[in-house]
């Protein structure tokens, strides 16, 4: 097989979700080395390392011939690479290999959940261009959320149940595991303003959150638009309804308890200030400014058969 790329760099974190990261590295390099003349394997020891390596690749200090990047890890590790590529304007394709708790965006790319299978898919995968979310000075592929979704992420970090990941818990157990905090919000989306009280706001680029598809057939990370959802109902059985419906369901048939607002530029303030979940990483607080950057990143995509 002819090598597609000259020099690929495979990033990984030793605290990846894989039980044996070294074994995982070995399992993916067979396929990756078949499409790269030269494959570098780069450990990220500390948070922020991948962003530094992206800077070195941009300035050619890492190597002069890097023409593709791979990442083995969960959404948090992928998020760091996305930030490195966007911050340093690396016009390079990225191949994502699942290796963590969730890899929501790999579902969008039709990539297998198993890292070894995913690496084999990279051989025939095609490069697609995707929108990126900019949040203040950070970047994300999939979503920005606050309220209940942040409480959920903090529960996961504490080793508790992942409500969004285990949908059977939504509705009944959510009230016992979490006491959703009401907060006031002021939202501006493409110069239209919205305000009120809620327990959760989500802005989505991709169609999957927590492993489940948002039932909007036209939600796409390639349409130059973001989708904001305001959860107006206090009853969280509504979440169960949303995530269990099929794609063919009309949004308005499901519930009147969630407001859906598409848009490109978003400003959000809350009272009190709220923590913000960006693709599973909690690193900001409100107020925040959000915008979509169309066709900003190149990702290896498996053709949907």
Swiss-Prot record:
Cofactor binding note: Binds 1 Mg(2+) ion per subunit. This ion appears to have a structural role and is required for catalytic activity.
Cystine pairs: none
Binding-site positions, Mg(2+): 220, 223, 225
PROSITE patterns for this protein: DAGK (PS50146)
InterPro entries in the cross-refs: ATP-NAD_kinase_N (IPR017438), Diacylglycerol/lipid_kinase (IPR005218), Diacylglycerol_kinase_cat_dom (IPR001206), Lipid_Phosphate_FormReg (IPR050187), NAD/diacylglycerol_kinase_sf (IPR016064), YegS/DAGK_C (IPR045540)
Protein name: Putative lipid kinase SAS0691
Gene Ontology CC entries for this record: plasma membrane
Coiled coil ranges: none
NCBIfam families membership: YegS/Rv2252/BmrU family lipid kinase
SMART domains, A to Z: DAGKc
Organism: Staphylococcus aureus (strain MSSA476)
Active site per the UniProt annotation: 281 (proton acceptor)
EC number: 2.7.1.-
GO BP field: phospholipid biosynthetic process
Protein keywords: ATP-binding, Kinase, Lipid biosynthesis, Lipid metabolism, Magnesium, Metal-binding, Nucleotide-binding, Phospholipid biosynthesis, Phospholipid metabolism, Transferase
CC cofactor: Mg(2+)
């Amino acid at each position: 097989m002819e090598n597609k790329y000259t020099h690929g760099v495979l990033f990984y974190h030793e605290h990846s979700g894989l039980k044996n990261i070294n074994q995982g590295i070995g399992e993916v390099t067979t396929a990756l080395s078949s499409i790269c003349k030269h494959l570098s394997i780069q450990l990220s020891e500390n948070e922020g390392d991948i962003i530094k390596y992206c800077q070195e690749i941009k300035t050619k200090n890492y190597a002069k011939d890097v023409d593709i990047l791979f990442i083995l890890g969960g959404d948090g590790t992928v998020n760091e690479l996305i930030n490195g590529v966007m911050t340093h304007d690396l016009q390079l394709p990225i191949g994502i290999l699942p290796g963590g708790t969730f890899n929501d965006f790999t579902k969008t790319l039709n990539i297998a959940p198993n890292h070894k299978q995913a690496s084999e898919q990279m051989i025939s995968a095609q490069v697609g261009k995707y929108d990126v979310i900019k949040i203040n000075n950070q970047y994300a592929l999939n979503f920005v959320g606050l309220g209940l979704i942040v409480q959920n992420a903090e529960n996961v970090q504490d080793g508790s149940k992942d409500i969004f990941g285990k949908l059977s818990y939504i509705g009944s157990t959510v009230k016992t595991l979490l006491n959703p905090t009401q907060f006031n919000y002021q939202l501006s989306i493409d110069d239209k303003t919205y305000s009120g009280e809620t327990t959760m706001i989500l802005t989505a680029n991709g169609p999957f959150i927590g492993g489940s598809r948002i039932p909007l057939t036209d939600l796409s990370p390639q349409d130059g638009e973001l989708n904001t959802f305001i959860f107006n109902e206090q009853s969280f059985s509504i979440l169960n309804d949303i995530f269990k419906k099929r794609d063919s369901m009309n949004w308005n048939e499901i519930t009147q308890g969630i407001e859906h607002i598409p848009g490109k530029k978003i400003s959000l303030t809350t009272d009190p200030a709220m923590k913000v979940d960006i693709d599973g990483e909690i690193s900001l607080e409100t107020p925040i400014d959000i915008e979509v950057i169309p066709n900003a990143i190149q990702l290896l995509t498996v053709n949907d058969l």
